[in-house]
């Protein structure tokens, strides 16, 4: 039994839509950060799917996915560090209350 490219793309679309919904509607900064990570994972699924089912199947999509995952890990580390610093100053993780970076 083989899985077609449309199945991969449908899973990626659902993941991206859930991530976009969370990023646009939620007010908790941690949830927004996790939603952005969901969107990046949807992109990774697309890269691997197009790499596997392309005209000339290769590992290029998987290499780009590894690079994207590395950048996403750095993004999470920096984002969480900023959130911890903001929480210490403002004592909230609500996005609406974090409109300025000065003390």
UniProtKB/Swiss-Prot annotation:
One of its GO terms (cellular component) is NADH dehydrogenase complex. Keywords: Cell membrane, Membrane, NAD, Quinone, Translocase, Transmembrane, Transmembrane helix, Transport. It comes from the Bacteria. One of its GO terms (biological process) is ATP synthesis coupled electron transport. The keyword Ribosomal protein does not apply. It catalyses: a quinone + NADH + 5 H(+)(in) = a quinol + NAD(+) + 4 H(+)(out). Its main location: membrane. InterPro entries: NADH_UbQ_OxRdtase_chain4L/K, NUOK/Mnh_C1-like. Its EC number is 7.1.1.-. The chain crosses the membrane at residues 5-25, 30-50, 66-86. GO terms for molecular function: NADH:ubiquinone reductase (non-electrogenic) activity; quinone binding. It is a multi-pass membrane protein. It is found in: Cell membrane. It is an enzyme of class 7 (translocase). NDH-1 is composed of 14 different subunits. Subunits NuoA, H, J, K, L, M, N constitute the membrane sector of the complex. NDH-1 shuttles electrons from NADH, via FMN and iron-sulfur (Fe-S) centers, to quinones in the respiratory chain. The immediate electron acceptor for the enzyme in this species is believed to be a menaquinone. Couples the redox reaction to proton translocation (for every two electrons transferred, four hydrogen ions are translocated across the cytoplasmic membrane), and thus conserves the redox energy in a proton gradient. Belongs to the complex I subunit 4L family. This is NADH-quinone oxidoreductase subunit K. The lineage of its organism: Bacteria, Bacillati, Bacillota, Bacilli, Bacillales.
